[in-house]
């Protein structure tokens, strides 16, 4: 809006409202006046008539003469803070604030410069916003041309003056000074020297403006990210972070860049300081400046550092260069490795050629020897059976058929080394379910050397063919857990069975061991003699006192000077007197006849005689009797131990387990060896006095005893081993073959072992009439082939008939639909559920009398060791359970638990098993779970049933507390129910809290399943009763 005075037309002294044009930058466009000389522009915002002013008398607007100078106008200040009128426009500024200057306006083509009227405006249609409607709008009040202003507020007058509110405020601009720039006065004062009145220092120049980057700023942010490249690979992130932060500025982020494919560090790091972008940029520049000035180094390498641009161009260049370096280094390594490989390949080829030549030479030598040696091996059990190298004897199912081939993986050739072995295939005893330790435990009564496990099966390796054949004949087709040990005995190609050679080797080995022991003893005695008889006298001669008389005198004088003067006291005199009396008493006892018991008693209470002090150089010439005796005893014991340990691999310890055939010779020899060892130990423990009293045996008696032993051995060797008497109950020479139904030709050949059997068969068949067969050999061959054709395959032999309840009535189970099989019926056909009338343990034996190993295997231990073990066991039991209170510490509870594990159970799902033997009344494990209230337990039990989670593991402590181990618990929750359990549960207090602990009721073997009686209440509804599957002899049939 602009105020215009139109003297030419309309109401004189009035004002007209006209529209304004323009934007914020151009300001408001002033209204056009017909009188160009009466127009005065102020700041391009408001137009007033040039030369006009207000009079204070009548408030009239009177224009001055044309061409006169504009007076010094002064306007009243608006009540608003920015000096605007209520209409929104700025009021005229006073001359003291700003000097108004006219603005030049360029004329538009066709328009009058003075009037601003264009003749061509009539050609265009006039729009509504271009027309002036002020003359048509009626005024809301009467127009007073004398008063064309309104004062709202005057900031110069104080507000405390109450009388000024009634006065009329009017300001005509009296006493106005000339216009001056206030900045010049301020700059002059700052540029001059400081006066005494102020302490302000002058500015050397005007302060420069600073532009802080924020979220509203345009353009890129200042660079604040620092890049370090070519760093050593050994530098870590904490080290570099500490190195940078010690300059006083904390870091915001630091990233180590690695190769995305290989994850190898590229030696490039980017980091940034904390703070706003402006501050971070300044800190980064200062840090780069200090690094370049001081030439800082890390691990001997100078830091290469620079600021990263906003587009990451520098970072990308450094990444590309680092990747190129990595590729070059990798190529160099590959080239070097290829060179090394080529060298290794060449060396290997040379070695292979040499090895081939050596092998060819050895094979040629072996072939020459094998031609001379017999290629057949006669069985030690049956002389009719002849084994050849590179042959396999099949199981009893195939009537011990011999095949001319051996199954031996290449990986196991270096372990077997052409020794006989027994193969148990994986389809009969799976290697994934049964470990080699179980096989070792089952065959521990045989002298095997190794048990190897492979994907094809188990390989039991033997050193002797006799032991391998004995194990094969005794253990073939025996039951092992729920499987059968179907064995195949294999004899490799390079095996030679020379019994005499083996015996000679064993005797030679014994002789070699004896000679080695003797040589070691001779060496020790020789070293002792050299030390005592040669070295010691020469050293004593060199250190003789005669050669150093001056030193001896000096030492004596020093010793005498150093000795303090001894003052004899009354106590010392008493002790001396007592010592004299004691010596007399001892002399009197020595004169009496020495009895053995009295001598022993006095010897026990006799004080030890103090050895005389001898210089070190003379001590080598003397031997202490007591030391020699103790040394001899310890040496003899060590020798006995060495003999036993040395002879262990050659002569194994006699096992107390039962065997099918045990010879009297081996048992007698073993007894003699045990008696000799006991006599040796007794001789060692006898004191020296008893050894002197004991009569020595004459050499003639010893020779007679040796002759008798030799004669006994010769007589025993003449008798065949098979027909010698046994120490156990009488049994057959050959193992009995079970009757398999049809007695065919194979069974007849297998039963007739020797000439005696043949004579008995002839007597039995003497009354039968001979058949009229022309060719018996052809008939026997045909009958054997017919038997092989009719034989059922090995897989079908394991298929058993299902019970009637599980048989299909329609002929196909698919047509019957889905039905739930009860747990009791699953026992009939599931392998891990076959537990009918079996004890609850994992290691089971088919025949308790024959197969179960002797439980008295520890009988070889001395009685002293057994008594000590029993005392220790009783002390542990009394310490744990007998005198145990219900209050324990948490450490004691955790330390006393036994090692247990969980596995598939034959009772139900998972079960808890002991990993080592556990004695009765010992603590086993704590029942761990979430401790909840009774109401929560009832709610959870219902929710578990709804969700179909199956088993819930809730164990009640008391009426208010329940342990829930369903989702938060230990492995103790897997313990199954049994009507005759092996464990029980006790509730004890640990650090003020009740806990459930499981104890052993009886002795538990290793790998035995732990069971517990759930003690559920009897259910009245028979449909809700749960079937018990423990299989114990006294099973109740139901859990509840």
Swiss-Prot record:
It is found in: Nucleus; Chromosome. S-adenosyl-L-methionine binds at residue 1014. Keywords: Chromatin regulator, Chromosome, Methyltransferase, Nucleus, S-adenosyl-L-methionine, Transferase. One of its GO terms (molecular function) is histone H3K4 trimethyltransferase activity. One of its GO terms (biological process) is synaptonemal complex assembly. It is an enzyme of class 2 (transferase). It comes from Candida albicans (strain SC5314 / ATCC MYA-2876) (Yeast). Its EC number is 2.1.1.354. Residues 635-644, 698-709 have a biased composition (Acidic residues). This is Histone-lysine N-methyltransferase, H3 lysine-4 specific. Residues 1-129, 175-202, 353-374, 591-664, 692-737 are annotated as: Disordered. It catalyses: L-lysyl(4)-[histone H3] + 3 S-adenosyl-L-methionine = N(6),N(6),N(6)-trimethyl-L-lysyl(4)-[histone H3] + 3 S-adenosyl-L-homocysteine + 3 H(+); N(6)-methyl-L-lysyl(4)-[histone H3] + S-adenosyl-L-methionine = N(6),N(6)-dimethyl-L-lysyl(4)-[histone H3] + S-adenosyl-L-homocysteine + H(+); N(6),N(6)-dimethyl-L-lysyl(4)-[histone H3] + S-adenosyl-L-methionine = N(6),N(6),N(6)-trimethyl-L-lysyl(4)-[histone H3] + S-adenosyl-L-homocysteine + H(+). Its main location: nucleus. The RxxxRR motif forms an adapter helix that bridges the nucleosome and ubiquitin. Residues 71-84, 120-129, 710-721 have a biased composition (Basic and acidic residues). Residues 97-119 have a biased composition (Polar residues). Residues 85-96 have a biased composition (Low complexity). PANTHER family: HISTONE-LYSINE N-METHYLTRANSFERASE SETD1 (PTHR45814:SF2). Residues 18-27 have a biased composition (Basic residues). Disulfide bonds: none annotated. Residues 1024-1040 form the Post-SET domain. One of its GO terms (cellular component) is Set1C/COMPASS complex. It comes from the Eukaryota. PROSITE patterns: POST_SET (PS50868), SAM_MT43_1 (PS51572), SET (PS50280).
